[in-house]
């Protein structure tokens, strides 16, 4: 049995050297990055068995994705390969900013192979047999086919007794708040553990008020066992079976903020799968996220010792 299975798109990230613009760059650094695979990598590096599945073109670009994930001990045996010449590998370009010039992201993900992935193409037993199955709101946004597949995966997992985890992860460049809300509300009925940025809950689901009221409202309305609300510099809050846990942020010198939220989820799930309480899982989530911000790339190159050191030096979890 695999502890964690994640499902979604992973893209290739192409970045010019810091201080250079995309339009003048002569070199681009290549890395892999995607919400669900970032979560799998973080959990795997923190000692949990983790797998990621998706659909990739059988090309050097698709194989580049798998090679990088495997280097971090993520199981990719469930990946569906296609030799369809029209199936592309999604790419995004990241130009690092420096005040007053903002960081700029340009996506080139249309017609990615994953957008055609149907439920019958992969082995659902991997989902049914996992302890936790995770995906995010990015996945159903990519295509109607993938939206249906996401619903099937969450339903099958929950019906089999697998804990289903979902991060709203709303992206304005993919769909409107109304489009996202319609899909999210259907999916949330099959979610046991929800991660939601405070701004996403407000923008997409119309949930205003303080973090605790937002978390309790979502938990009650959708019968979700645990709801974790992230609040940026104000930390995070979780409501689980009626009990509230809070966690502050850890001070960090930010080098690359991309992937911070995924590292948070990966850290939480790693501790959760190790039998940790919600308060302990929030500590690990916050510590993993802070450590990620010191590392280049989407992926949290972190160890359990790294997280334990951050928690030991600055732990400030609260449970009430």
UniProtKB/Swiss-Prot annotation:
The active site is at 262 (proton acceptor). Pathway: Carbohydrate acid metabolism; 2-dehydro-3-deoxy-D-gluconate degradation; D-glyceraldehyde 3-phosphate and pyruvate from 2-dehydro-3-deoxy-D-gluconate: step 1/2. GO terms for molecular function: 2-dehydro-3-deoxygalactonokinase activity; 2-dehydro-3-deoxygluconokinase activity; ATP binding. ATP binds at residues 169-171, 230-235, 259-262. The keyword Nucleotide-binding applies. Disruption phenotype: Deletion of the gene abolishes growth on glucose, but does not affect growth on galactose. Double deletion mutant kdgK1/kdgK2 loses the ability to grow on galactose. Pfam families: PfkB. Its EC number is 2.7.1.178. It catalyses: 2-dehydro-3-deoxy-D-gluconate + ATP = 2-dehydro-3-deoxy-6-phospho-D-gluconate + ADP + H(+); 2-dehydro-3-deoxy-D-galactonate + ATP = 2-dehydro-3-deoxy-6-phospho-D-galactonate + ADP + H(+). Induction: Constitutively expressed. The keyword Repressor does not apply. Substrate binds at residues 34-38, 92, 107-109, 171, 262, 298. Keywords: ATP-binding, Carbohydrate metabolism, Kinase, Nucleotide-binding, Transferase. Homohexamer. Belongs to the carbohydrate kinase PfkB family. Involved in the degradation of glucose via the semi-phosphorylative Entner-Doudoroff pathway. Catalyzes the phosphorylation of 2-keto-3-deoxygluconate (KDG) to produce 2-keto-3-deoxy-6-phosphogluconate (KDPG). Also catalyzes efficiently the phosphorylation of 2-keto-3-deoxygalactonate (KDGal) to 2-keto-3-deoxy-6-phosphogalactonate (KDPGal). This is 2-dehydro-3-deoxygluconokinase/2-dehydro-3-deoxygalactonokinase. It comes from Haloferax volcanii (strain ATCC 29605 / DSM 3757 / JCM 8879 / NBRC 14742 / NCIMB 2012 / VKM B-1768 / DS2) (Halobacterium volcanii). The gene is kdgK1.
